[in-house]
A protein has these predicted regions:
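Beta-rich carbohydrate-recognition and catalytic domains
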Residues: 1-157, 163-218
Length: 218
C-alpha cells in the first residue's frame, strides 16, 4: 500500500469528472497527477486521512480563506484561496474532544451566522458531536452529542451533514450506519467474502462489519 494522498477532481455537472494535472506532488516518480497533498508532507501531511474542505459562503470571508477545512487530531483550522494550496490558519487546535480518525466537516450556517462543525466520538458506540464558532479559528463551543428521534438506530460513523440549499434553516445528513456482530454463521455470506478474509487477517472487524447509508434532517 502507498501513502495516503488527497486528490482533486473537477466536474461541471457532478456527473462527469476529470482529474487535472496539477504538477504539485511527486508520486511514483512523476508530478503528472491530481494530488494536492500527501501524508509525507512535513507540515500538513497529518490531515490527509480526515480532510473535508468546504467553500465558505460567509459574506465577510477574506479572499485568501475562501476555502476552509478542519483536519488532524486534534482538529486544526485550515484555509485556502483556491482549494488547492492549503495552510494552517493557526498553530493551536480548535477542537480537542472527539475521535478524529474519520470524517470531520464544517460549514458556515447562513441562518444563524456561525460556523458549525461535526465529528465522531463514542457514546455507546460510534456517534456524532457538534459545536459552533463565530470566527472559525477560535472560540468554539463545548461539543455536544446529537439527539435523535426516535433513537439513533445503531452506531453512526461518518455524518455528511450540511444545510439544505433551498432552505438553509434545515440541515440534512447522510450518515453511515456501522454494524459489526463479529464472526457469525451468516458472515461468510457477506459480499466479497474472500477479500474480507484477507482484510480480517489485518483487522478483525474489517472482515465482518457492514455499513449502510441513512438519511436524517433537523
Amino acid at each position: 500500500m502507498h501513502e495516503q494522498v488527497y486528490c482533486l477532481a473537477i466536474s461541471k455537472d457532478g456527473i462527469k469528472w476529470t482529474r487535472p494535472k496539477l504538477g504539485l506532488v511527486e508520486f511514483e516518480g512523476s508530478k503528472d497527477n491530481n494530488i494536492i497533498l500527501t501524508e509525507k508532507d512535513p507540515v500538513l501531511g497529518y490531515i490527509c486521512h480526515n480532510f473535508s474542505p468546504f467553500l465558505d459562503v460567509n459574506p465577510k470571508v477574506s479572499a485568501e480563506a475562501r476555502y476552509k477545512a478542519v483536519g488532524g487530531g486534534p482538529l486544526f483550522p485550515l484555509v485556502s484561496a483556491d482549494g488547492i494550496q492549503w495552510k494552517k490558519a493557526t498553530e493551536k487546535p480548535i477542537i480537542t474532544k472527539g475521535a478524529f480518525d474519520s470524517q470531520n466537516l464544517a460549514f458556515w450556517d447562513s441562518v444563524r451566522s456561525e460556523y458549525r462543525a461535526y465529528h465522531r466520538e463514542f457514546r455507546n458506540g460510534r456517534d456524532i458531536m457538534t459545536e459552533t464558532s463565530d470566527s472559525f479559528t477560535s472560540s468554539w463551543t463545548k461539543p455536544v452529542f446529537l439527539e435523535y428521534t426516535p433513537d439513533r438506530g445503531g452506531e453512526l460513523y461518518t455524518n455528511q451533514i450540511m444545510p439544505y440549499e433551498r432552505a438553509p434553516h434545515i440541515f440534512i445528513g447522510f450518515p453511515t450506519r456501522y454494524e459489526d456482530r463479529g464472526l457469525t454463521p451468516s458472515t461468510r455470506h457477506l459480499p466479497q467474502w474472500k477479500y474480507r478474509q484477507k482484510r480480517r487477517a489485518l483487522s478483525l472487524r474489517e472482515g465482518t462489519d457492514v455499513t449502510e447509508g441513512h438519511f436524517m434532517s433537523s
